[in-house]
């Protein structure tokens, strides 16, 4: 079957965790699979997702909904953003929402916390991992209940994936 080996490296004097994985198909025939590596990052009012500048549209898991990005101008996940809403900001996303970008010529996706003046970048070679994705439970009561259920004391979070 499918096998995965993963190594984690912490280097001195660097604020980075390097993760290297190898996937091996032990089946007799080729197999297709999806691979998402996703760090969870702090969400909340000050959170903003940082997608590469060539990501101008996103879609949901099943490609049922498509939106301009980062400024949504239509309906996405049954939310009316027709006034032009920055959906890269956590505070503007009330419902559980995923943003998937199929391709990018850049090697990163990130998060920035305006309240803390800091953030992170998730770096992956775009020739190997061309897609970018974000998942959020949203800031409504429903989303807050899931955040509380799935974290210890850290509150809202966003999943970033490449």
For the regions a protein language model found, what residue spans apply to each?
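Low-complexity, acidic Ser/Thr/Pro/Gly-rich terminal tails and inter-domain linkers that flank the onset
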Residues: 1-13
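A contiguous, surface-exposed recognition patch within enzymatic or periplasmic domains that forms
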Residues: 15, 26-162
């Amino acid at each position: 079957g499918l096998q995965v080996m993963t190594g984690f490296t912490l280097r001195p004097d660097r604020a980075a965790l390097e993760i290297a994985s190898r996937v091996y198909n032990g089946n007799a025939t080729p197999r297709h699979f999806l691979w998402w590596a996703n760090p969870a990052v702090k969400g909340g009012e000050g959170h903003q997702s940082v997608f590469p500048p060539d990501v101008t549209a996103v879609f949901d898991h099943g490609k049922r909904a498509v939106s301009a990005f980062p400024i949504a101008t239509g309906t996405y996940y049954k939310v009316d953003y027709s006034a032009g809403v920055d959906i890269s900001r956590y505070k503007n996303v009330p419902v559980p929402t995923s943003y998937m970008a199929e391709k990018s010529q850049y090697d990163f996706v990130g998060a920035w916390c305006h309240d803390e003046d800091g953030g992170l970048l998730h770096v992956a070679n775009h020739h190997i991992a061309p897609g970018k994705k974000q998942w959020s439970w949203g800031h409504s009561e429903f989303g807050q209940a899931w955040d509380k259920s799935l974290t210890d004391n850290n509150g809202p979070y966003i999943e970033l994936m490449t």
